Curated annotation (Swiss-Prot):
This is Bypass of stop codon protein 4. It comes from the Eukaryota. Coiled coil: none annotated. Open reading frame that exhibits genomic organization compatible with a translational readthrough-dependent mode of expression. The sequence can give a readthrough frequency of 9% when cloned in a plasmid with reporter genes. When the initial stop codon is bypassed, translation will go on to the second stop codon 321 bp downstream. This protein has no orthologs in any species other than the S.cerevisiae lineage. It may be the result of de novo origination of a protein-coding gene. The lineage of its organism: Eukaryota, Fungi, Dikarya, Ascomycota, Saccharomycotina. It comes from Saccharomyces cerevisiae (strain ATCC 204508 / S288c) (Baker's yeast). The gene is BSC4. Changing residue 19 to Q: In strain: XH1549. Changing residue 92 to H: In strain: AS2.724 and AS2.820.
Length: 131
C-alpha cells in the first residue's frame, strides 16, 4: 500500500485555520495462497482505497513519524478484523522516499529517515498476511 501524507487546511466558522494530516492509502496487498504463479503475475491481491485523517492534536512535538505509523498500523489491523472474520497480521516493510515535514519545524521528524525536499510524499509498503 502506498501512503501519501498530505497537510490539508480547513477553515471553521471563525476563520481559524486548523491543520489535519491526511494519509491516503492507495492499496493494500494480500498474498494469494496458490501455486504456481504465472511469470510476471503479482502474487498479491489489491484491496480498495482507504483514507486516514489525523487531527492536529495527535501530532505534537514529541510525536515522531514512527509513532504515527504505529497508530496507523493499529487502525488498519482493527479495520481488517472488522472486515472479515479471519485474523490478519499486518507486516510492515517500509520504503521511505522523500518526506514532507509535519510542520515548519523539523523536530517532529525522525532524523533517521531520509529526506528529499523536492518530492513531497512518503511511500510505505504493507503486506497483510493471513493467520
Amino acid at each position: 500500500m502506498s501512503i501519501v501524507l498530505r497537510k490539508s487546511n480547513k477553515k471553521n466558522k471563525n476563520c481559524i485555520t486548523s491543520k489535519f494530516y491526511t494519509i491516503h492509502i492507495i492499496k493494500i496487498s494480500t498474498p494469494v495462497f496458490r501455486a504456481p504463479i504465472a511469470i510476471g503475475e503479482s502474487p498479491y491481491v489489491e484491496w480498495s482505497c482507504l483514507q486516514v485523517v489525523f487531527r492536529k492534536d495527535m501530532v505534537t512535538k514529541k510525536t515522531t513519524f514512527a509513532q504515527l505509523i504505529t497508530r496507523l498500523n493499529h487502525f488498519l489491523c482493527q479495520a481488517l478484523k472488522r472486515r472479515d472474520s479471519k485474523t490478519y497480521i499486518l507486516c510492515r516493510t517500509a520504503v521511505f522516499g522523500a518526506m514532507t515535514p509535519f510542520s515548519p519545524r523539523k523536530s517532529h521528524i525522525n532524523n533517521k529517515l531520509p529526506m528529499q525536499p523536492r518530492k513531497k510524499k512518503i511511500v510505505i509498503i504493507y503486506v497483510v498476511r493471513f493467520h
